[in-house]
């Protein structure tokens, strides 16, 4: 499957047609397509980020133990974990960064989420969920 697969699909929330840039973002983030009203749909970046924001704000996060630095939890290393800000899939290096810097993974609605390298670089390091998760 290539990025062309997502081109000309509709956003599942706002029903805008996805262009080349949105199609490439869906391909990079491995967004699953759905059928709504007979239309094949994915999600545009604006709707995805708004949905993730609402999920962070409305649902109480639960911290996830990821194992020690010497012995990582095998589930964390093998599971498909997405970024809680942009929806991208965390790479193995990003999962290692979480472990080495003792960053928390959190569970929202039975989904384990973390932070990707890009979102951490753009100033999202001091996440608001940290105060709630340690209590």
Swiss-Prot record:
Subcellular locations according to the entry: Host cytoplasm; Host nucleus
Family recorded in the similarity comment: Belongs to the papillomaviridae E6 protein family.
Complex formation: Forms homodimers. Interacts with ubiquitin-protein ligase UBE3A/E6-AP; this interaction stimulates UBE3A ubiquitin activity. Interacts with host BAK1.
Gene field: E6
Protein name per UniProt: Protein E6
Pfam families in the cross-refs: E6 (PF00518)
GO molecular function: DNA binding; zinc ion binding
Main location: host cell
